[in-house]
Structures are given as C-alpha cells and as structure tokens.
A protein has these predicted regions:
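A short, well-structured juxtamembrane/interface segment
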Residues: 156-186, 251
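Interhelical loop segments of eukaryotic multi-pass membrane proteins
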Residues: 4-6, 51-72, 141-151
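Cytosol/nucleoplasm-facing, intrinsically disordered, low-complexity tails
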Residues: 1-6, 178-182
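Catalytic core of membrane glycerolipid acyltransferases/transacylases, capturing the structured
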Residues: 125-155, 182-263, 273-291, 331
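Pocket-edge structural micro-motifs
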Residues: 170-172, 192-194, 230, 271, ...
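Alpha-helical bilayer-embedded segments of polytopic membrane proteins, i.e.
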Residues: 9-59, 70-133
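Low-complexity, charge- and small-residue-enriched intrinsically disordered regions
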Residues: 45-65, 166-167, 339-350, 354-356
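Non-catalytic C-terminal accessory region of glycerolipid acyltransferases
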Residues: 2-29, 259-378
Length: 378
C-alpha cells in the first residue's frame, strides 16, 4: 500500500496566533532569567563541591589514600568549575555591582556626605575614562584581538585540557614530505565544527598554551597562531572583554574578520554558530554548513585558505533536551538567537548533591585539523 499523503497544516486563527505570540513573549521574558539563575546556582554548587573534594588533597598531599591520579582529577575538576563560576557568577555579579555603584548614588546625591560624593565622582571619572578607552579608542577586538602570552600560559588552561583529555591531531603529520595544514603562505581560516554547548574544545585547545605546544611539535603549524572569533556580546561587558581579547578573541563580524586577515592573522570561526548548539546531542555530530557560506565568501575576498577542524566528543559534555521544531520553546530559542546572537539550550551535565548542574561531564575531546583548501582571491 502506498503511503498516505500528508495533510496540510491548518492555518492559525487570528485569536490563536495572538495567544501564541503572547506565550512566546512571556517565555522570552521569564525563561532567560530562570535559566541564568539555574546556571549561576549550579556553577556555584559545582565549584563548592569541587573545592570540598580538593581540600583534603591540599591538607594531606602525601597521604597514602591521596594518589596522584585522584589528586590531579580533583584539581582539574576544580579549575573547570572555577572557570564556569567566573563566567556565570563573577562576571554578571561584577557587571551588576558596576552599574549599581555608578548610578545608584545619583538617586541619593543630595543626601550623600562630602567624602561619599568625592569618592563617587572619582569612580564616575574612572568608569567614564575606562568606557571611553574600551569602546571608543581601543579597537583591538575588531581586528583580531591581542593574544597575551602571559594569560595563555596560566596553568588553568592546561588543567581544563587535561580534564577533557584534550588531544589535537594534525592530518599529514605522520607522513613524510606531506604538506599538511601549512597550505599556502597566506592567512588561514580554521572552520571549527561542531559548536557544542560551550565549545570546550576551543577553550581548552586554541585559547591556551596547549595550542603553542601543538605548534612546537608540528612540522606544519610552527608559525600558525590563531585568533578566536566570538559573538559581539562577549566583547561588550566591561573587564570581561579584556580577558577575552587577551586570549586572542575578537568580534566575529564580516569587517572584523577582514581586518584580522588583512593583518596576516589566522582566525578560527565556528560557521555553524549558536544554532548548532541546539543539535548537540550526545553521541552525535550534527553540523550546519550547507546554508553557511559567509566563511567561503570571506576566504574568496582575502584569498585565505580554509582549514577544516572537526572536534570529536564536543557534543558529549552535556545532556540536551530535544525541542520539536515549531514548538514554543524552539521559537523562543530562535528569538534569543536573533536578539543576542546566542541560544539558550536546555541542557545539564554532572549531577552533584542530587541536582543536575552545568558542570560538564568528563569526556575525551579529539580535535582533528585537516589539510587546507586553497582559495583564489576574487
């Protein structure tokens, strides 16, 4: 028997469409604060839990029961949770304090004492000077970042890489006389797939000194430093932008990428973007590339080589709630993506103290760097 033809979808009535729009709006308003609270609370829980686990090893480093393997695992887990705590608690909290200290005294300006008024004026001058420098003068986040060697050498990064048993494999390194990813002599665009939930492979592999070690051991990547493209939101938060730009991060816009390539820099982008995180189900590698052609046009504009990068295990860090396309939750995610440039997938990692948290599962990551695809400038 032949398959029955699918029926046409019934169009929504005006009243149903209005109710649907109201539901999406309410979810957009309330879901993001709820998810942000969940992320902050569970990040705090994770760093507290890992600190308690690590503490006995610090007190009794030579105790027979404190083996080096267990001690290293405890340190690695602590630094992973500390990095998440910094991003999800310290940065938002610091931004809130920055805003309160700047604007709240203006409400009580008449009742402030002379010393408080003086201190507030000093703070306003300092904050205004920083904002002028950061957002009007300093343009490094729009032309490839800075990449401070000191920041990249921090032991934090090597511990995060060890937590995921991070390994970067370069195609062609095992062969004799092969060109490998060196390709031509121009700039390269490293195209990283998949995005995953938090792209731990990029953080552990390319934003750290781990990438320098890979280059030193490679025949084909010794002179190939990489700058990391990220959404503009990450370069707007005061102070946080300084950390970002000094690990080689820059705003991944068309003009910023062009300027970075014009400086002769190699850049890493994630063509699938935040939309790819919606498909980061464990045990899968869902890549969105057919509809993403901007990176190809970018390579054509500058004559840069395209270097494919695949991260195996990137989607295994978290459990992800599957959302049906067209559902309210799915549409809310699309609204967030259009407004902020990122999505807020419903996910969870390790369960600590009976609560699912944002702490990633300890899963191995293997990043494979392929040979470059030569592109002729048009």
């Amino acid at each position: 028997m032949g398959a029955k033809p699918e029926g046409k979808k019934t169009p929504l009535t005006p009243s149903r469409a209005a109710l649907d729009a109201i539901a999406v709006t309410l979810l957009c308003i309330f879901l993001l604060p709820l998810l942000a609270s969940y992320a902050s609370v569970t990040a705090t829980l994770a760093v507290t839990h890992n600190a308690f686990v690590l503490w006995p090893y610090l007190l009794h480093p030579w105790h027979p029961s404190a083996g080096p393997h267990d001690r290293d695992q405890a340190i690695e887990a602590f630094w992973v949770s500390a990095w998440m705590f910094y991003n999800l608690v310290v940065i938002p909290g610091g931004l809130a304090v920055f805003i309160l200290i700047t604007f709240l005294p203006l409400v009580f300006l008449g009742s402030l004492g002379p010393l408080a008024t003086l201190l507030h004026r000093v703070w306003l001058t300092t904050a205004a000077s920083y904002c002028v420098w950061a957002y009007l003068i300093d343009d490094s986040v729009n032309r490839g970042g800075v990449a401070s060697p000191t920041l990249r050498r921090l032991g934090l990064w090597s511990r995060i890489a060890s937590y995921f048993d991070m390994k970067i494999l370069v195609e062609g390194e095992e062969g004799e006389g092969e060109e490998g990813p060196r390709g031509g002599h121009g700039s390269r665009i490293f195209c990283y797939h998949p995005h995953g939930i938090i792209f731990w492979g990029v953080i552990a592999g390319f934003a750290s000194w781990h990438w320098k070690e890979v280059r030193l051991q490679s025949r084909t990547l010794q002179s190939c430093d990489v700058r990391l493209g990220t959404i503009s939101f990450n370069n707007l938060v005061p102070v946080f932008r300084e950390v970002n730009k000094n690990i080689g991060s820059f705003t991944v816009s068309w003009n910023s990428c062009l300027r970075a390539l014009e400086r002769g820099l190699n850049i890493l982008i994630i063509p699938g973007g935040a939309r790819e995180s919606m498909d980061a189900f464990p045990g899968t590698m869902n890549v969105r590339i057919r509809s993403r052609r901007g990176f190809v046009r970018l390579a054509l504009a500058r004559g840069a080589s395209l270097v494919p990068v695949l991260s195996f295990g990137e989607s295994d860090m978290y459990n992800l709630l599957k959302m049906k396309p067209g559902s309210l939750a799915f549409r809310v995610q699309r609204v967030y993506q259009s407004l902020f440039g990122f999505t807020v997938p419903l996910f969870w990692g390790k369960t600590l103290w009976g609560m699912p948290t944002i702490m990633p599962l300890r899963r191995p990551i293997r990043v494979v760097i392929g040979k470059p695809i030569q592109v002729v400038s048009t």
